[in-house]
């Protein structure tokens, strides 16, 4: 499989290493500005790369959105987070002409977490729910795209839900419809996501901890391996 990388930060550097270990080839990199330290051919536009089988994106909205407005037809794996609604609308449009895969978290374990959460929410309908995510001190966006995904699962199953990001100015007791959302940034934490169900005299916690960023890179590669054989359409872990 010949892979074009969109962005060449820490994540796509891992994708390159792991993909080559699997026998795949990196045919180029798209970066906002050329860098002498990038060990692959650099491009400005997706359409300039003629021999790629798939593109894998671990970048940011500033780089990705202008590229998505260009004319190209290439299977696309997208892991960028930020401006989610705008991104999903654009990817849905592109999926009419190419296979597109998107996940806010490329770990299959996190996908499993969403399924566990979907089963737990109806069973624990009268429990309070608090969501917490923790990441390294270099992560810019908060809350994480993954936590937003977990929140979306809850919203799809409960009525009149209210996200609460900060309680220090509320000066009132917790309301039944509140969903607490908390972000922690520090050190080199790869990624942790926890769902707390708090009931009367008991609590239940569901936690996913990433031990290495390799799980995200491998997840993107595995998605790409499947996507190249798919017809045009919008894919997630649910239908890939």
UniProtKB/Swiss-Prot annotation:
Pathway: Amino-acid biosynthesis; L-lysine biosynthesis via DAP pathway; (S)-tetrahydrodipicolinate from L-aspartate: step 4/4. It catalyses: (S)-2,3,4,5-tetrahydrodipicolinate + NAD(+) + H2O = (2S,4S)-4-hydroxy-2,3,4,5-tetrahydrodipicolinate + NADH + H(+); (S)-2,3,4,5-tetrahydrodipicolinate + NADP(+) + H2O = (2S,4S)-4-hydroxy-2,3,4,5-tetrahydrodipicolinate + NADPH + H(+). It is found in: Cytoplasm. (S)-2,3,4,5-tetrahydrodipicolinate binds at residues 136, 145-146. Its EC number is 1.17.1.8. GO terms for cellular component: cytosol. GO terms for molecular function: 4-hydroxy-tetrahydrodipicolinate reductase; NAD binding; NADP binding; oxidoreductase activity, acting on CH or CH2 groups, NAD or NADP as acceptor. The active site is at 135 (proton donor/acceptor), 139 (proton donor). It is an enzyme of class 1 (oxidoreductase). PROSITE patterns: DAPB. Keywords: Amino-acid biosynthesis, Cytoplasm, Diaminopimelate biosynthesis, Lysine biosynthesis, NAD, NADP, Oxidoreductase. SUPFAM superfamilies: Glyceraldehyde-3-phosphate dehydrogenase-like, C-terminal domain, NAD(P)-binding Rossmann-fold domains. GO terms for biological process: diaminopimelate biosynthetic process; lysine biosynthetic process via diaminopimelate. Gene3D superfamilies: Dihydrodipicolinate Reductase, domain 2, NAD(P)-binding Rossmann-like Domain. NAD(+) binds at residues 79-81, 103-106. InterPro entries: DapB_C, DapB_N, DapB_N_CS, DHDPR_bac, NAD(P)-bd_dom_sf. Pfam families: DapB_C, DapB_N. Catalyzes the conversion of 4-hydroxy-tetrahydrodipicolinate (HTPA) to tetrahydrodipicolinate. Belongs to the DapB family. NCBIfam families: dapB. This is 4-hydroxy-tetrahydrodipicolinate reductase.
């Amino acid at each position: 499989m010949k892979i074009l990388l969109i962005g060449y930060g820490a994540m796509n550097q891992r994708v390159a290493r792991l993909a080559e270990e699997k026998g795949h080839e990196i045919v180029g990199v798209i970066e906002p500005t050329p860098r002498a330290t990038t060990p692959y051919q650099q491009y400005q536009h997706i359409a300039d790369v003629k021999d790629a089988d798939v593109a894998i994106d671990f970048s940011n909205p500033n780089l990705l959105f202008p590229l998505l407005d260009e004319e190209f037809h290439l299977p696309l794996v997208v892991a960028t987070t930020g401006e989610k609604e705008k991104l999903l609308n654009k990817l849905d449009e592109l999926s009419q002409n190419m296979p597109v895969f998107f996940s806010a978290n490329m770990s299959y374990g996190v996908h499993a977490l969403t399924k566990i959460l979907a089963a737990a929410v109806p069973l624990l309908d009268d429990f309070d729910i608090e969501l917490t995510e923790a990441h390294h001190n270099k992560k810019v966006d908060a809350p994480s795209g993954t936590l937003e995904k977990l929140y979306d699962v809850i919203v799809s199953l409960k009525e009149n839900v209210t996200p609460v990001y900060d309680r220090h100015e509320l000066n009132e007791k917790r309301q039944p419809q509140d969903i607490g959302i908390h972000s922690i940034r520090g050190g080199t934490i790869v990624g942790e996501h926890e769902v707390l169900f708090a009931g009367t005299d008991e609590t239940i916690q569901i936690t996913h901890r990433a031990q290495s960023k390799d799980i995200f890179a491998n997840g993107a590669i595995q998605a790409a391996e499947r996507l190249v054989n798919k017809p045009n359409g919008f894919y997630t872990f649910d239908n890939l």
